[in-house]
């Protein structure tokens, strides 16, 4: 799974747990795998109601405390599935800052937070090459519709199954096996995400952990050699490959958002 998307998900999931629990304790999300290659992170609120000058936090805990002080009571992952430019979204996702998904902080005054990842130390001995800067601003656009957990789960099972079946027909045996393994967590009683398993707090409900694990295992949109770098074995199959890939990317993003956003399971 893309580390930038995973970090958004982790901030939302762990941030909501912190807001709903004991706020005297620190949020430990920065110690998790979504920050393992991050050298520094900064959060800057650039403008908003009653903001006379930029407000900066140097870690997630300080950011969350500032949000709470400004009346924020929940965080939401807002997935952007539309094509961000000339490249299809599932192709653009292979590049740094390729996703335009963001965090919506809701409460007394809504804020939208967008991340920018920059390589600052390309030869860092501990591989912490990235500096991440989240910029927040007041927001009135609201949250795009995100499916309920159950419907997101069903749609992603269908999309991953379609990708598996296409891979089998095209002779891509390794990819067929990849998706088959991803689908094994769909009904697991103890799901483990293939990547970033700690993005969700341990207290997360089974349905959320199962959906995130399925999304993590189904995310195949990287650089060279990834699923989105392939070409169909015949011209007639190219359109189907692109259609299946676009649907898979959309459903993965929606599934990640459904897994971490603070909706009640009884409504799904």
Language model: regions and residue ranges:
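Phenylalanine-focused residue identity feature
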Residues: 35-37, 43, 95, 170, ...
């Amino acid at each position: 799974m893309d580390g930038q998307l995973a970090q958004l998900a982790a901030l939302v999931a762990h941030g909501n747990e912190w807001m709903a629990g004991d706020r005297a304790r620190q949020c430990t999300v920065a110690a998790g795998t979504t920050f393992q290659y991050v050298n520094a992170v900064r959060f800057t609120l650039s403008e908003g109601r009653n903001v006379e000058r930029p407000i900066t936090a140097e870690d997630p805990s300080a950011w969350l405390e500032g949000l709470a002080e400004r009346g924020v009571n929940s965080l939401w992952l807002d997935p952007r599935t539309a094509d961000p430019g000339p490249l299809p979204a599932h192709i653009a996702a292979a590049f740094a800052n390729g996703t335009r998904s963001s965090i919506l902080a809701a409460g007394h005054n809504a804020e939208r937070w967008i991340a920018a990842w920059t390589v600052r130390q390309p030869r860092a001995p501990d591989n912490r090459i990235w500096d991440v800067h989240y910029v927040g601003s007041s927001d009135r656009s609201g949250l795009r519709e995100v499916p309920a957990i159950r419907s997101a789960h069903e749609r992603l099972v269908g999309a991953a199954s379609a990708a598996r079946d296409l891979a089998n027909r095209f002779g891509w045996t390794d990819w067929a096996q990849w998706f088959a393994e991803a689908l094994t967590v769909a009904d697991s009683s103890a799901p483990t995400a293939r990547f970033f398993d700690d993005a969700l707090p341990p207290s997360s409900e089974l349905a959320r952990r199962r959906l995130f694990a399925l999304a993590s295992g189904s995310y195949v949109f990287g650089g060279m050699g990834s699923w989105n770098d392939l070409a169909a074995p015949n011209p007639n199959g190219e359109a189907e490959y692109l259609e299946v890939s676009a649907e898979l990317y959309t459903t993965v993003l929606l599934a990640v958002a459904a897994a971490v956003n603070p909706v009640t399971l009884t409504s799904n």
